[in-house]
Amino acid sequence: MNGTLTLTAAVALGVVWAYHAAAFQADIASVKFQDVAPESGLSFVLHNCPTPQKHMIETMAGGLAVFDYDGDGRPDIFFTNGAELPSLIKTGPQYWNRLYHNEGKMKFRDVTEEAGVAGQGYSMGAAAGDYDNDGHPDLFVAGVNRNILYHNLGNGKFEDVTAKAGIRSGEWAVAAGWFDYDNDGFLDLWVVHYAKWSPAYDRYCGNQTRGIRIYCHPKYFEGLPSTLYHNRGDGTFEDVSTKAGIASFAGRGMSVVSADYDRDGHPDVFVTNDNMPNFLFHNRGNGTFEEVGLSSGVALREDGKAVASMGADFRDYDNDGLPDIAVTALTGETFPLFRNVGKGNFADATYASRIGALSSRHSGWGVGLFDFNNDGWKDLFTANSHVNDRVELFESAVYEEPDSVFVNLGNGTFRDASTGAGLNESKAHRGSAYADLDGDGKIDVVVASLGSSAELWHNISPETNHWISFRLTGTQSNRDGIGTHIRIGNQQNDMISAVSYASSSLDGVHFGLGRTTSIDRIDIVWPSGKHQTLHDIKVDEVVNLREPR
């Protein structure tokens, strides 16, 4: 890192969003990662408690979050963990959720006990966001019949405020995301549920004659709708699912991501569903949503088939200024890539981008669109593994797989750079999170795996390209600036927290700049509608950006 720059910047109200002269050329320079978890102090192992009964929840654990909980400028790492089955009780430290403090220089320290975040129940997903705008990011943990909202006290400790905040439990929640759907300056919470389930559910799936039991197909589970909690601004939340018009849309939800895909100033929501059509909830701007997944072209593949949609990211991969949607799925289904073509419509670009051919033999969970080689084009990382640990007995597929990275060539297509990148660890990968963990200007990756140690992929790609990152402080908007749009040249990136599979990455907004050595102009639009313009900005900096009042 060359330094940190704090700016309040010039304000230009009513600026028209437009492309600027600078364009970024794709650089096929190698992307390279090294797993430094063993020497970093990151010793987390995800204990999902596999049983002979093959409870579905066993194969779906693994969400995590990266966020700077203590405000020291270094992103920390939180992992969700399982529990004993069938009791759903964390009977020992092996089942604790874990928080690791970033000590700097890729070293981490377990602070779970002192922070008070070991948790309860069988945990699934994590979402970080400062819901009370006090400058200390809070944490929501989604789980099976037990959700937890932790309030960050600002002294290295968290308080469980679930009950008094009005957050309910009792259903199987997989993932969640913070976003300000009504732009009132307070983050709201969207919680995704999978299906009706209890430990007493004991359907036998597989080949009973051969004594081979497997996890049941999703079709045997009745899906559930998501829950939307409106932040009242006083530390409490109201369930507005019915009022907002989402309560009637039941699905087997896996992940949630939010972005303003039609640039009308109101954040929209995409929910992946397992072997059901995906949901795209268009924000009408009056407190209600319209489900438009089918009409917009993101509910199904181009051939009209639903896939086992797992994780998702909602960012602009082709630098046309509109956020696109990347999804992971099972082997043989490909990883759908939906290109935003404007006017509320998406085109299936899975095969046109070559992601279809490159991903057809993989099963994916976590996913992220980030510029790993800083050439100005977002690449695609996927955390891979099949859902069924006995799949080799029935199909020509494998259970444990290495992760993948597909490099964006800047012409609408990708190439598989996984082998050369060093992604060679075959595990039952699940959630993934993304952040510049050591401040060197390159995005690193953390991946959780069932029954195995977490991976900490340090980005050691050649430092031939430049970059800039923004840490946002909202004043009229939510404190984290979630939902902010930033444009540099032909690039646009949004401040998004929910990402991947059941995971969260709260680490500002990052841009790769290629060989660009100075930036003439940067345009920012905050969720409040406030426009901001920066001029003549240095590269290779972390910019602390505060919303003007």
What spans do the regions from the language model cover?
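Hydrophobic beta-strand segments that make up the repeating blades of beta-propeller
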Residues: R74-N81, D134-G143, L189-H193, D268-N273, ...
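Repeat-based blade/solenoid architectures
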Residues: L42-G63, A115-A127, G166-G177, F221-L224, ...
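Gly/Ser/Thr/Pro-enriched helix-cap/hinge segments flanking short amphipathic alpha-helices
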Residues: A23-K32, P50, K54, R354-A357, ...
